[in-house]
Amino acid sequence: MAERKVVVANETGLHARPAASLVQFVKNYPGEVKIIKEGKEANAKSIFNVMSLGIAKGTEITLVVEGEDEEKFADELVEFINNLSE
């Protein structure tokens, strides 16, 4: 299991388009990916789960990746989130 903390910098947080982009990116990973915000956990492969967390700009989230090459994918996921645009 690989865990990473990241602060969401995107102006709109993880809503609508950024959330959809994130889900599409994560769906390519064969393992399990979760996002945790303030104790609430969501499956990162589900747009509804991701959006239900209400992640705004400046929110710290924890990413949990389990599966093949989890450390590498966790790092790629942090980079993806840091580069999200509206």
Give the residues covered by each predicted segment.
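Intrinsic-disorder/low-complexity, polar/charged segments enriched in Ser/Thr/Lys/Arg/Asp/Glu/Gln
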Residues: M1-K5, E60-T62
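C-terminal structural segments of small proteins and small subunits
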Residues: S52-E86
